[in-house]
């Protein structure tokens, strides 16, 4: 059974890790042993990813940076020939994306409604963080922020209902700057995804650590013609 296999893997790996840990610091040796004990979890996750790739008929697998890079190494080590029980597995690549790099490009417009997607996850919003999310230089809007009574270091509770933030988004100069920034970021992301083989019409598996799937949501909005199947370890 698979359980017996994992028990065997653990029994084989732990003694090897103890031997390999000799000469290391106590902290390093403990970390090495912990990794060996967790080997069945990592291997089981990679095996499940391969099974899902076959069952879901996925065209390509993407492991998101940065946590996904480790699992990409595990996956490639387990399936060096790209096959599982006689089935061909899709290509597996690392995709350098983050919540920040995919959110702004996925926005339809510069509006409070679009921002509420991220505010539903985080109930507070720092003013400086807002500008970083939108890809804007906050220094260019110092006068406007002062007029609206918004300090750069301020943290706003319930941002969706903030009068000051609503006024900010309704200011033509700010709205135009956001629109231009979104266009540029969308163009850059679209070019990167195309270069990475991710286009509309494909079936893609994505691998990451977590449970919210925020990046997957952003990607699905940005490439609506693609099918995404998320595989997470949370």
Where are these regions (language model features)?
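Short glycine-rich phosphate-binding loop at a beta-alpha junction
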Residues: 58-65, 203-207
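A charged, amphipathic alpha-helical module
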Residues: 147-205, 209
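Phosphate/oxyanion-binding active-site loops and adjacent basic polyanion-contact surfaces
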Residues: 34-46, 67, 178-185
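Histidine-anchored nucleotide/phosphate-binding helix
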Residues: 47-52, 70-81, 215-223
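Mature, well-folded catalytic/scaffold domains that follow N-terminal targeting or propeptide regions
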Residues: 1-21, 38, 42, 72-73, ...
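Extended charged low-complexity segments that act as oligomerization/scaffolding linkers
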Residues: 1-38, 53, 73-145
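A short, well-structured juxtamembrane/interface segment
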Residues: 41-55, 185-195
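An acidic- and aromatic-residue-enriched active-site/binding cleft used to recognize and process polar
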Residues: 66-67, 97-100, 209-212, 233
């Amino acid at each position: 059974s698979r359980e017996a296999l994992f028990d065997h893997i653990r029994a084989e790996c732990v003694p090897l890790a103890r031997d390999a840990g000799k000469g290391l610091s106590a902290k390093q040796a403990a970390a090495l042993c912990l990794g060996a004990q967790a080997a069945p979890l990592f291997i089981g996750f990679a095996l499940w990813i391969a099974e899902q790739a076959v069952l879901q008929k996925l065209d390509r697998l993407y492991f998101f940076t940065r946590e996904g890079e480790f699992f990409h190494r595990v996956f490639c080590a387990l399936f060096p020939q790209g096959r599982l029980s006689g089935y061909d597995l899709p290509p597996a690549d690392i995709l350098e994306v983050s919540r920040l790099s995919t959110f702004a490009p996925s926005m339809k417009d510069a509006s409070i409604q679009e921002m509420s997607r991220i505010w539903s996850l985080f109930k507070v919003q720092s003013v400086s963080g807002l500008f970083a999310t939108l890809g804007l230089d906050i220094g260019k809007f110092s006068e406007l922020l002062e007029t609206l009574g918004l300090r750069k270091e301020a943290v706003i509770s319930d941002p969706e209902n903030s009068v000051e933030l609503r006024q900010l988004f309704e200011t033509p100069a700010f709205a135009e700057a956001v629109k231009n920034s979104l266009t540029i970021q969308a163009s850059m992301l679209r070019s990167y995804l195309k270069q990475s083989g991710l286009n509309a019409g494909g079936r893609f598996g994505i691998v990451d650590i977590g449970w919210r799937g925020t990046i997957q949501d952003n990607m699905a909005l940005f490439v609506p013609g693609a099918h995404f199947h998320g595989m997470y370890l949370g």
